[in-house]
UniProtKB/Swiss-Prot annotation:
This is MFS thioclapurine efflux transporter tcpA. GO terms for molecular function: transmembrane transporter activity. It is a multi-pass membrane protein. Residues 13-24 have a biased composition (Polar residues). It is found in: Cell membrane. GO terms for cellular component: plasma membrane. It comes from Claviceps purpurea (strain 20.1) (Ergot fungus). Coiled coil: none annotated. It comes from the Eukaryota. MFS efflux transporter probably involved in thioclapurine export.
């Protein structure tokens, strides 16, 4: 069985000077029956936790911005979470490779719980953003960890269907999230959106502790803990994190808080370019500092799958962030009602994520689901961008459902692709890389959407209401902005708000169209053939 290159296997210290042990791999033993059921339940709980945390806040954001008077932070509550989630995917992938998957997963759950507690107690918007970033750091390990437990527990031919179930549970959480978040925001407090994570996280940790077993790869058994930690390349990851923070700050502040020509915006974008260049130089010139394994860098399927993941996930996060705003600000819905109104999107995603797993399991190919995603999501997002003040219920239900169907077909396929085209020892890196691109798509394009939203709103109001002080809009909340206008001004302001949201959804449309590049680039390879190869390898070991 091929392994990653030498530069990725030997970090520093004693392990790097020790010859690789001659390890005879035992026949792979997979879980079945009751044990496999318990494992799948634990994975469903962990992904339910993450899925709930991603969407439960969406319907509460307008009320949060009203409380903190921070409409300019509307995107940060999502971006901060996704930024840390995406940036540390590869670091977690390396930790999962050399250390116990179970141990790292429990650590990630603990970090996630800490972030949730900080969010629940946040006295201001800045503290809430910090808490979201910490929770995202924990979620970064939960996503790949749950998938890798499944890799250890189930044979290849069963993984697509089981992955469909676990992804479906993520979808169920996503479905429940807006409804639960809206109920908390209207009835009790938006802080309960984060308090609820504590008991759910504890239950998940208990099940993982007592029922999940993931052996450490014998290839790394002789490595010291210091060597294993060095292998994660944390300093290099921090360079990437700093670069992404500069990019996001530049994209969110440019044209709103500061002019694009302002020295601070220029400095942020220049620092982003310098740090990104430094990160790439480390990857090319210093093999021992390489964060992304050579086997992944040279694999075209991973790169095209990553493009697909970046675009599809970016579109999904834009939709779940701004659709509740549309319903609350334009349709005068309560937080709870807006959660109900976005259910066509989430339910469509849920249903098709499960069906796509069955299709892949039946046909042996993940490519058809990727093309269906491109077609349906592009049409659905384009129709959603036409939402205005008078859009009737049948249209906003059907258009959302179509978008959800499309994204549901494709969102899990890049992960299935990574599991299929990579050697088993490279799967942790591949899954982590795909997850990183998914979260990065949300972080970047939600930031872009916030910029378009705030700029468009300020410029649109200035044009519709000459002489109006647009700075009042930035200093207010998402829904109480209506109190800024007189009864004569409001009929002119609301259509501007709706038009700007339509521009935001056009960004999602462009991303859905962009998934076509990934769909075309991924090679057609049968998952069923992988099963035959796996069986032959088991026979040879015997």
């Amino acid at each position: 069985m091929a392994t990653v290159g030498t530069e990725e296997k030997n970090p520093i210290g004693s392990a790097s000077n020790t010859a690789e042990p001659n390890v005879t791999e035992p026949q792979k033993q997979y879980a079945s029956g009751f044990k496999l059921t318990i494992i799948v339940i634990s994975l469903c709980l962990s992904l339910f936790l993450c899925g709930l945390d991603q969407t439960i806040i969406t319907t509460a954001v307008p009320i949060i911005t009203n409380d903190f008077k921070a409409i300019e932070d509307v995107g940060w509550y999502t971006t901060a979470y996704l930024l840390t989630t995406s940036s540390f995917q590869i670091a977690y992938g390396k930790l999962y490779t050399t250390l116990s998957v179970k141990m790292i997963l429990l650590m990630a759950l603990a970090i996630f719980e800490l972030g949730s507690i900080i969010c629940a107690a946040a006295p201001n918007s800045t503290t809430l953003i910090v808490g979201r970033a910490i929770a995202g750091l924990g979620a970064a390990g939960i996503f790949p960890g749950s998938t890798l437990v499944l890799v250890h527990a189930a044979p290849m031919e069963r993984r697509p269907a089981l992955l469909g179930i676990t992804t479906g549970m993520f979808g169920i959480a996503s479905l429940c999230g807006p409804f639960i978040g809206g109920a908390f925001a209207d009835g009790a407090s938006w802080r309960w959106c984060f308090i609820i994570n504590v008991p759910l996280g504890v239950i998940t940790a208990v099940i993982v502790t007592f029922f999940v077993f993931t052996p450490v790869d014998p290839l790394y058994a002789e490595w010291t803990f210091k060597d294993k930690l060095a292998y994660a390349k944390i300093p290099e990851i921090l360079v990437l994190v700093a670069a992404l923070v500069c990019l996001v700050l530049g994209l969110q502040w440019g044209g709103t808080t500061y002019a694009w020509s302002d020295g601070r915006i220029i400095a942020l974008l220049v620092v982003f370019a310098v740090l990104t260049t430094a990160f790439l130089v480390l990857q090319v010139l210093l093999p021992k500092s390489r964060t992304i394994p050579t086997s992944i860098v040279k694999n075209r399927n991973i790169w095209f799958a990553s493009i697909f993941a970046l675009c599809s996930s970016g579109a999904m996060f834009i939709a779940v962030t701004y659709l509740p705003i549309y319903f609350q600000a334009i349709k005068n819905a309560s937080a709870l009602s807006s959660g109900v109104n976005v259910m066509p999107l989430i339910l469509g995603f849920l249903v098709m994520s499960i069906i796509s797993g069955v299709i892949t399991n039946t046909t042996g190919y993940y490519n058809p689901s990727m093309f269906l995603c491109t077609i349906l999501a592009s049409v659905g997002a384009g129709l959603v961008s036409t939402f205005d003040v008078g859009t009737p219920q049948p249209k906003w239900i059907g258009y959302q459902a179509l978008l959800g169907f499309g994204i549901g077909f494709g969102l899990q396929q890049p992960i299935v692709c990574a599991q299929h085209v990579l050697d088993e020892r490279d799967v942790p890196f591949g899954v982590a890389f795909i997850n990183m691109m998914q979260m990065l798509g949300g972080a970047i394009f939600v930031a872009v959407s916030q910029n378009v939203f705030l700029n468009g709103l300020a410029n649109g109001i200035a044009e519709a209401l000459p002489g109006f002080n647009t700075h009042k809009i930035i200093e207010g909340g998402l829904t109480d902005f209506k109190n800024l206008f007189t009864s004569d001004q409001l009929p002119k302001a609301i259509p501007v708000y709706a038009h700007v949201l339509g521009q935001v959804f056009l960004i999602a449309t462009g991303l859905c169209v962009g998934t076509l590049l990934g769909s075309l680039g991924v090679q057609w390879r049968s998952v069923k053939k992988a099963k035959v190869t796996e069986d032959q390898a088991d026979v040879e070991r015997k």
